[in-house]
Each structure stands twice: as C-alpha cells, then as structure tokens.
Amino acid sequence: MKDNLERAKLMVSSTVFSWLLLCLFAVTTSVSVQPTCTFPAIYNFGDSNSDTGGISAAFEPIRDPYGQGFFHRPTGRDSDGRLTIDFIAERLGLPYLSAYLNSLGSNFRHGANFATGGSTIRRQNETIFQYGISPFSLDMQIAQFDQFKARSALLFTQIKSRYDREKLPRQEEFAKALYTFDIGQNDLSVGFRTMSVDQLKATIPDIVNHLASAVRNIYQQGGRTFWVHNTGPFGCLPVNMFYMGTPAPGYLDKSGCVKAQNEMAMEFNRKLKETVINLRKELTQAAITYVDVYTAKYEMMSNPKKLGFANPLKVCCGYHEKYDHIWCGNKGKVNNTEIYGGSCPNPVMAVSWDGVHYTEAANKHVADRTLNGLLTDPPVPITRACYRQ
C-alpha cells in the first residue's frame, strides 16, 4: 500500500515536471521564432543628451574640441563623440540621424532628430540666452514632426530627381519606425532654480502628462513602437559642484552627488514609469518600452573603477579650478595668463565631458546596459521592442 502511494507520488511529480518543461519549451520556442524587428527609421525627441546638431544649426555652432574623438570634428553633439542615440542607430543598422533643423547635408530617408540641447517637456518662460533653455520644447518638436510628415509626403510626389527623393522618408514606414524619447532633465533643472522642492515635486505629474500627450499624438498618426528613456541622476553632474563651496552635512550622497536633485529625478522616473504602464493599457496596439538610463548612469558614479573610469566628477574638457572656470572650447585668463579649455588627454577614462554632458565612453556604457534589455521594462532588447508584451 505504502509502495503504491510512493509510486503515485513519483508519477505525479514526474507529470508536473514534464508539464513545466513543456511550458518552458513552448515559451522559449515562442520567443525564438519571433523575427528581429526591422525598423526602417528612427524619430527622436529630446534634449542635449540626444541632439545630433539641432541647437547648433539653430544658434551658434558647437566648436572644437567637441566631436574630436569619433567624428574628428564638431558635429553639433555635446560630447567628444557619439551619443546614446547614435549607438541605437548602429544597433539597428541605420545611419546616424540628421537634425531636423539642419538645412545642409541632411538625409531623412531613415528618420529625423527633433531633439535640441536645452529642450524641456513643458514650455518655459525663458530664452536660450538667459539660461540655455531651448525654444523647442517637446510640444514644438511634435509640431515639427507633424509638419515634417505632411510636407515629406507632398514633396515625394513633386520631386522628380531620384537622388533627392532618396533623402525623403517613405510614408508607409512611419508606422513601422521606432520613436525614441530622451527628455525631462531640464524641466527639473529649471524647477530647482525657480521653485521650492515641494512646488517642483507637485509639477511632476503635469510634466509627465505632457510627455504622454506626445506619445498619444504619434500613436494617432500610426506610430506603434516607443522607446522612452527616464531621466538621469542630474545631481551627479560636476557643474553642480563648481560654485558650491563646502557642502553641508548630508547634502551629498556617498558618490558625491547632490541628494535632493537625484531624489527628484527618481520621483520623476517613478511617475514616468507609472504613466508608461497606463499608456500600454490605453494604446492597445502600442509597444512601449521604459528605459532606465538613471541606473546605467549612476553605476558610473558609484563603481567607476570597476567600469574602467577614473574620477567621475572630474571634468574632461574645460578648465575648472577653485573659482576659475573656463568652459570647454573657450579661452579665458587665469592670473593674467590665457588658458584654453581643451580636452583631457584620455577621454575614454572620463565620465563627464564638459561638466554637463557625458563622454562617448559613458554614452556607450549607457547603450550597452540598456539596448540588450537588462535595464528596460519590459526586459526586451531594442531589436525586439516592436513586440507588445
């Protein structure tokens, strides 16, 4: 009797184990048979973290030594080389994005970049000449996209030159394109300058709702795949330390970053993720990926040596000593001696390029940590981001 009972238990256990293996095989097979997403184009919206020449085309061109590493010349990027959006294009086998505002040498066959340095999600009552805030807020970038989409359709039917038509997007490919967002940091920076902490925190839901409206706009025009970056730990930007003096106890965290600013960034990210989850329910045909660049960037602050970096708070380009500050690419006098704010000898070891923006090496780390799905929700690589989870 006892032996029969034991045999029965073994049979049940074996059946359950076999069933679990079958389910695992079915899930694995289901995932493996999904073909890699083929994105014909990328349309990007953002700020200087992903601007490939927009603000430089609209205002004063970015000068040397920006771009010295990879491109060997300034290209309108706030870095010594490539940005995360460039690594996204590489991963998808697409050319680097031309800035929408760049009128010369642009090719929009495989997408366009509407991002500009200093952009915010919400419109700000400031000018770029005051605090560096771009006039091209997210709603303006979406309006530019609307116009771009409509005008490119018209031009495609009017232009007779095959060479010129090859620089225009195909209308049927807008629905298959990848739409990327990397914006929000400047909204928080402006808030810290103009509001109390409580006032700024109270504006976060509205800021995030403006971003959600942008996603809805593109969805209504046929866009289906969205790759949404959260905001980085802007309390770790070395510029925060330039004029700080001796910080009060508890002002900085263990990595030397401004705690209050990073806490606000995390609050923004919490609300953004919540909004992305709700958008998935609302936009039933959309595949929306939330991308945690905050963690990828903070890793470089907390474990720089492990990742191959030197002091992450040390600025690579520019001259910053005590009370003397000469920004990257500029000249100034220190003790009656002219100083050029040039590049450090080994940017690949640096995290911060100019005190505000990241080096190519840092941007590559962010790309490596996010494009494979390790820091995304849902946890899918960008090459499978077109599938709704």
UniProtKB/Swiss-Prot annotation:
CDD domains with a match to the protein in the record: SGNH_plant_lipase_like
Signal peptide (from-to): 1-30
Residues glycosylated per entry: 125, 335
A GO term, aspect molecular function: hydrolase activity, acting on ester bonds
Keyword annotations: Glycoprotein, Hydrolase, Lipid degradation, Lipid metabolism, Secreted, Signal
Cell location: Secreted
EC assignment: 3.1.1.-
Primary subcellular site in the record, as a coarse category: secreted
InterPro entries per UniProt: GDSL, SGNH_hydro_sf, SGNH_plant_lipase-like
UniProt keyword Phosphoprotein present: no
Biological process per Gene Ontology, one example term: lipid catabolic process
GO CC list: extracellular region; plant-type cell wall; plasmodesma
Active-site residues, record numbering mapped to chain: 48, 354, 357
Family indicated by similarity: Belongs to the 'GDSL' lipolytic enzyme family.
Stated name of the protein: GDSL esterase/lipase At5g14450
Annotated source species: Arabidopsis thaliana
Organism ancestry: Eukaryota, Viridiplantae, Streptophyta, Embryophyta, Tracheophyta
